[in-house]
């Protein structure tokens, strides 16, 4: 893995740890937002390995599907939950939407699956 991709993946892992701590403290919205960003950084790491970079969140998820999923490097099932969580993250961050433990935990679990998949797919390159 390139140094830049490794930095991005480490950032994803750190955000996962932070999201777990926030969830344990009952801060569901903060945990969900942080978990989303953990997935985003994992996705950026995967794209970085292909020398790709997106300018927006929406563009990142689209590029990940078109290049990484289409090439069979990551499964759709680990990418789509995080892509679909973008709207929830925006509602939590910008509209003060309240969510419960279950929704935050689901997003954290999805982020963990994506981080793990990126580690497995790109970690030994």
Region roles according to the model:
Residues 1-125:
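Terminal alpha-helical segments
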